[in-house]
């Protein structure tokens, strides 16, 4: 039996114990993990330092290094995230709906654990902790496979998690870590039908495409974020600028950052120069359509590929659109279905945008950066789904459960 298959088998056995534990036992385990992460903080930071050194030698981009980096504050943030999950309502056992049939059968739809969840992800070590916290609270075991660039960090984090679990009723085997740089381990995970109930990829477009195309285990596709901000002719100029700067510049290397700006031609000449000046002072490279190049000298002409690119860096594609419909058509063609925002004071235009744009999250007069489990009140998230089955948008505890039908009778048989 291969190592990956053996890990999944151990997780499946442990999941049986986890699935029947009550909320108090699960919360106690999460608190123990949080305490152990704080106790092991220096060890974790030292391990992360090795990964950062290796990443710099490998020439990782600044955005990837930012995703990879851990600090004392970021570890504290992980711990705070766990504590928030502790406070969240346990979805397991929740009765979603009930009804009675004419023959007297009482039927209830009840939330149950997923079972064993496989997580394949890149760079971000915080995903290790967020995933474990959410999966354990939702009653599922987890098999983790992070990227080789974060191997030392993930190894230290999983060690702390397992040490925390050793003090609780939850078996250590509920958390398994594929401690290998072999990319073949990912392919093996994707074919573990009967052992893994679900695989969630979280990373760049290449990783997600590879998982979706090769998996025989069910997959929830988390999103590449080619997000747009559309500044309508009826937008408040100051509000539009503030939203744009937040959506693009607050943090470049995240999937809910804006990658394209669409501006109605009715305000482009007056509004764009000031907006681009603000972007330039923050080091953002502009790639514009022909109309943008006419309005602003020195702007790089956008290539067709730029409209479909998730830059994850200080680069922004800007297009002047002739009207609202032109903006909708552009978003329809290039959106990855993650997060899309309109800035306008016209309520009818906003309503049409929110109705017609096909994305996991649509915004009116707000930044795309809010597409996040914490911001939505879910606590830590396992990812942001851009598909429509089984979950969409930020995936919290409820999205990590399934359900079953509990049917009670008094001796009924089918005629």
From Swiss-Prot:
An example Gene Ontology CC term for this record: cytoplasm
EC number: 1.2.1.41
GO MF annotations in UniProt: glutamate-5-semialdehyde dehydrogenase activity; NADP binding
NCBIfam families, sorted: PRK00197.1 (NF001221), proA (TIGR00407)
Enzyme class: oxidoreductase
PROSITE patterns the UniProt entry points to: PROA
Gene name of this polypeptide: proA
Protein name: Gamma-glutamyl phosphate reductase
Catalytic reaction annotation: L-glutamate 5-semialdehyde + phosphate + NADP(+) = L-glutamyl 5-phosphate + NADPH + H(+)
Compartment list: Cytoplasm
InterPro entries assigned to the protein according to its UniProt record, in alphabetical order: Ald_DH/histidinol_DH, Ald_DH_C, Ald_DH_N, Aldehyde_DH_dom, G-glutamylP_reductase_CS, Glu-5-SA_DH, GPR_dom
Function per UniProt: Catalyzes the NADPH-dependent reduction of L-glutamate 5-phosphate into L-glutamate 5-semialdehyde and phosphate. The product spontaneously undergoes cyclization to form 1-pyrroline-5-carboxylate.
Signal peptide limits: none
Family, similarity comment: Belongs to the gamma-glutamyl phosphate reductase family.
Pathway assigned in UniProt: Amino-acid biosynthesis; L-proline biosynthesis; L-glutamate 5-semialdehyde from L-glutamate: step 2/2
GO aspect biological process, one term: L-proline biosynthetic process
Keyword entries, A-Z: Amino-acid biosynthesis, Cytoplasm, NADP, Oxidoreductase, Proline biosynthesis
């Amino acid at each position: 039996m291969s190592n990956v298959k053996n890990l999944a088998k151990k997780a499946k056995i442990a999941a049986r114990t986890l699935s029947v534990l009550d909320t108090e036992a699960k919360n106690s385990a999460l608190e123990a993990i949080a305490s152990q992460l704080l106790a092991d903080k220096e060890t974790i930071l030292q391990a992360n330092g090795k990964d950062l050194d290796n990443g710099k030698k490998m020439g990782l981009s600044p955005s990837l290094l930012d995703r990879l980096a851990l600090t004392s504050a970021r570890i504290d943030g992980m711990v705070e995230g766990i504590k928030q999950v502790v406070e969240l309502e346990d979805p397991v056992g929740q009765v979603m709906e009930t009804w009675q049939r004419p023959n007297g059968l009482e039927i209830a739809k009840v939330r149950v654990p997923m079972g064993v969840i496989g997580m394949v992800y890149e760079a971000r070590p915080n995903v290790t902790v967020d995933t474990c916290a959410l999966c354990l609270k939702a009653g599922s075991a987890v098999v983790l496979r992070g990227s080789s660039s974060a191997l030392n960090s993930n190894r230290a984090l999983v060690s702390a998690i397992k040490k925390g679990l050793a003090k609780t009723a939850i078996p250590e085997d509920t958390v398994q870590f594929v401690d290998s740089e072999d990319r073949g381990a990912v392919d093996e995970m994707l074919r573990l039908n009967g052992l893994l109930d679900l695989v969630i990829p979280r990373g760049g477009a290449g990783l997600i495409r590879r998982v979706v195309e090769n998996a025989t285990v069910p997959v929830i596709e988390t999103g590449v974020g080619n997000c747009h901000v559309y500044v309508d002719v009826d937008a408040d100029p100051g509000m539009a600028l503030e939203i744009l700067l937040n959506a693009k510049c607050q943090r470049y290397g995240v999937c809910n950052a804006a990658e394209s700006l669409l501006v109605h031609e009715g305000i482009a000449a007056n509004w764009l120069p000031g907006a681009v000046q603000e972007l330039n002072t923050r080091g953002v490279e502009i790639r514009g359509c022909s109309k943008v190049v006419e309005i602003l000298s020195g702007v790089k002409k956008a290539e067709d590929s730029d409209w479909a690119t998730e830059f994850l860096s200080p680069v922004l594609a800007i297009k002047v659109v002739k009207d609202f419909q032109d903006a909708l058509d552009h978003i329809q063609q290039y959106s990855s279905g993650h997060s899309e925002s309109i800035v306008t004071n016209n309520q009818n235009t906003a309503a049409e945008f929110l109705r017609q744009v096909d994305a996991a999250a649509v915004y009116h007069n707000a930044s795309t950066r809010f597409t996040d489990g914490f911001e939505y009140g879910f606590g830590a998230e396992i990812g942001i789904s851009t598909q429509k089955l089984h979950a969409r948008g930020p995936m919290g505890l409820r999205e990590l459960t399934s359900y079953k039908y509990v049917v009670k009778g008094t001796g009924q048989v089918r005629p």
